[in-house]
A protein has these predicted regions:
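Charged docking surfaces used in two-component/phosphorelay signaling
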Residues: 20-28
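Short hydrophobic/Thr-rich beta-strand motif most characteristic of the beta2 strand and flanking loop
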Residues: 30-37, 45
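Active-site beta3 strand of CheY-like receiver
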Residues: 49-55
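Receiver (REC) domain active-site loop signature in two-component systems and cognate sites
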Residues: 60
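DNA-binding patch around the recognition helix
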Residues: 134, 159, 202-204, 208-215
Length: 215
């Protein structure tokens, strides 16, 4: 994991007490912390602060976390930031919506600071392992480049959120192998993140929509 002194965390929640608790515990662990109380301010702060991790509440007035995540994922300089949703909602569609717009993890309230720190550390561990697997894969006119997280199809650049890219790269790197949903969840999201099997279906559908059904 990278040096915590250099890791920036943006906390976004409309409940001041939650923001203060998370800020206190993150700073105690050595992270640099910025905060925002709504989605609009979160996007502006993220552009200026350039966080490595964004803790994002789903249920916020004016602009919810899902829309905020979608906007952040469209900002090129923030495409590698980890986004962890914080929510009191347990419904399946909330989780699917979260991962559908590019979230990396999903934690329900009340949030236990120690558990949150472990989840953040786990994201960086998985990312570190993937950094060691950089390379390019070419399938007909499709070129998948992990070193730059870019996809080129017949000279046209295709942009995918991080998890969609990781899913495509993993499957392209293991051709002619059939994986179960559980195996894909383990390899892409990791065993320490609880994700519904339906999330895999959503990501595969979105990848196919963007690169074409022929692959």
């Amino acid at each position: 994991m990278a040096d915590k002194q250099k890791i920036k965390v943006l906390v976004v929640d409309d409940e001041p007490n939650i923001v203060e608790i998370l800020k206190y515990n993150l700073q105690k662990e050595g992270y640099e912390v910025a905060t925002a109380e709504d989605g609009h301010k979160a996007v502006k702060t993220a552009i200026k602060f350039q966080p490595d991790v964004i803790l994002l509440d789903i249920m916020m007035p004016n602009q919810d976390g899902v829309e905020t995540c979608l906007q952040i994922r469209q900002i090129p300089e923030l495409k590698h930031a980890f986004i962890i949703f914080l929510t009191a909602r347990l419904e399946e569609y909330s989780e699917v919506a979260a991962f559908d717009v590019g979230a990396d993890d999903y934690i329900t309230k009340p949030i236990k600071p120690r558990a949150l720190m472990s989840r953040i550390a786990a994201l960086f561990r998985r990312d570190s392992k993937k950094e060691q697997e950089k390379g390019q894969i070419k399938i007909r006119d499709l070129n998948v480049d992990r070193s730059s997280y870019t996809i080129d199809k017949a000279g046209k650049t295709i942009t995918l959120p991080k998890k969609e890219f990781e899913l495509l790269y993993f499957l392209a790197n293991n051709p002619n192998v059939v994986y179960s949903r559980d195996e894909l969840l383990h390899n892409i999201w990791g065993s320490d993140v609880f994700v519904l099997a339906r999330t895999v279906d959503v990501h595969i559908r979105k990848v196919r929509e963007k690169i074409g059904e022929e692959y």
